[in-house]
């Protein structure tokens, strides 16, 4: 190296370093990129890097800068470099301790390299992204971060000393014919003609030094689109579960009048308990013994409408209202009714109907034949639709229906003595079916539904089963109402009813055993009998 410096010392004194660099560039412009550049050995490149230093393109006094663009120096940090109108991020890898940042020479006298995109100046020497852009298979090793501390000191002493620049240039000039990678000394000169003074790293990495492989977007020669590996894989949007308010029905407090049945409105006052008792008392005391057909029809209409209204509006209150006429009808005086009120409420488990009032008429009027005839007419009239008929029409229809109903009763229940018992049973059956249509209560209506299933499955006829079921359910009412009567002719009437009820209980139990599947479901209703 001393020989090289001594040979070229006189020429360095006469010619300026940019002039020598331009001469070398013009002489070897055709030989910049040869086959040796692609097949160069990495070890030779490192050895030559210790000698080759791009002095003209990198090291110049700060006074010669023309204030174009500045690059701040930082170690291992990517610094933005404004080139033209678009900022370009260029890697800065080296930093020399205790030295100020020298600046580039923007006068265009740096060396050029011919690439596929035209002549390019190389202010940053041999970065790996340049080779990637030029499709070079050369992989530079990451050795020799800088040549040595002595080289750095010589470089920056030469920047201050007038004789140091020719020395550094002499180091580069003789090795240029042997350096195949030297054409990459000046990059981006033609691409960025408005390049001003740059603050490059104090120690620019030699051609043999390859820093950490920069990302493709760091290079101004690389495509503008970043690689897919640098993009965010996918935006993660996790919808959080938002609690949806669910409306919960809050029961509205009912008034004292309708507290028994919160789902139905209160019944009208015309069908209240008081008015019903007063009407029944008047019918019983005034014209119960003569038992006129007109009075019977009026009472039938009253009881029918009352039952329908109560069944559709207020179920819980319906039980108490229907039980009052029965007990009051079964007894002879109001004080006895006071005692039996509790008994009637206890028997509320049975299915109730408006039959006991008619049974009352039958029992109280059984002394004479006229009472039984009128009762038969009334019972047969209950089979008809609930249209109020005149006295003459009602009597005619009732007589015709009574004969048919009596014949049916004899067939289904041959053990009953007399037409009066048949008429009474017919009244009970019809009133029971009528109450079932109205649905007296939830407690009383459910057994009727299950009994209908049993009736259809067990093979029992509809007529026979309806009679048996109603007689067995109403046996308590028949016995109680008849036992309280003061008439002597009711005794022979009560005994057949009692025997018949016991017999029909057995039949019902047999029918239940015929269906073991339904027996367990009906167990909650029948033990109350």
Curated annotation (Swiss-Prot):
Residue ranges that the Swiss-Prot or TrEMBL entry lists as coiled coil: none
Upregulation: By retinoic acid.
Organism ancestry: Eukaryota, Metazoa, Chordata, Craniata, Vertebrata
Protein name as it appears in the record: Retinoic acid-induced protein 2
InterPro entries: RAI2/SOBP (IPR026092)
Extent of Polar residues compositional bias: 407-416
Disordered: region residues: 1-21, 400-419
